[in-house]
Amino acid sequence: MLQYNALMRHSTSLPTSVDTWLAAAAAQLRTADIASSRLDSELLLSYVLQRPRHWLHAHGDSTLLHEQQVQAEQLLTRRLQHEPLAYLVGHKEFYGRDFVVSPAVLVPRPETEQMISLLLQLIQPTQRTIVDVGTGSGILAITAQLELPQCQVDAYDISPEALAIAQRNAQQHGTTSVNFIQSDLLAAAQQRYDVVLANLPYVNPTWQRDDRETAHEPALALFAKDDGLALISTLLAQTEQWLAPSGLLILEADPCQHSRIIARATAYQLTHMQSEGYALAFAKQCSA
């Protein structure tokens, strides 16, 4: 890293073209075992220049300003430490839309889109109220509102910092009808909901984590006791009071945890309906 820092100090003193910077940055990212090295270097420079990636491809001989080089290399240094790219550029795509993110929230994952897929498959026309528990950046609540505009969506999170990010995203996407409420799971609920969405922390703290990027994400949003199932189990119990009869519960968890979640859910009149990747859906049985 000392050799790299010396190289960067030298490079900022000399004019550098787009192509030259991208090649050098991608090489450094490869040495740091970042598989998407070329893509990441392009996204970082696109962010600094406020230009789309295709502009970089067409203007490879353009010379970077000194301040642009300095900013790009500062971001590159952080990426070499495996800080998530989304935190560096301040946004991440989810379900075809761009969302603001910060270190206060998890970086949206592609597998979480499976929850939206199950929601759209399973929701019934009479089901009109949705709550997203542990909303984080608001991706599930906002996407649900955009895909199901006939529904009323509430979003709960214990973190005021996360709620601030979620509200920014709601404003960005014009979904100001979503209600954002600070709450520990469903503690603040005032009504029964037809649908409960919950991407809660489910990582067992004892698991070996190969992904160094998660070290930069909030532990509060990743880890849970009881082999990762503590918060999910608490929510299952809360559905007795706050999930409407015949209501729909959609969770995310590691597939290795699904069988235990399904077994625990039966104690709360929840019947497993369907799983898709990391997502699993339950229906609440009607009382006799």
Regions found by a protein language model. Give the residues of each.
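Short helix-capping segments at alpha-helix termini
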Residues: 34, 148-150, 171-176, 242-243, ...
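Mobile active-site "lid"/loop adjacent to the S-adenosyl-L-methionine
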Residues: 200-231
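Conserved Class I SAM-dependent methyltransferase catalytic core
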Residues: 100, 227-284
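Conserved AdoMet
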Residues: 46-121
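Non-catalytic accessory regions of SAM-dependent methyltransferases
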Residues: 1-49, 54, 64
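Flexible, glycine-/basic-rich loop-and-beta segments that form/coincide
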Residues: 286-288
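Short amphipathic alpha-helical segments
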Residues: 167-168, 208-212, 236, 262-264
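Conserved SAM/SAH cofactor-binding pocket of Class I
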Residues: 110-207
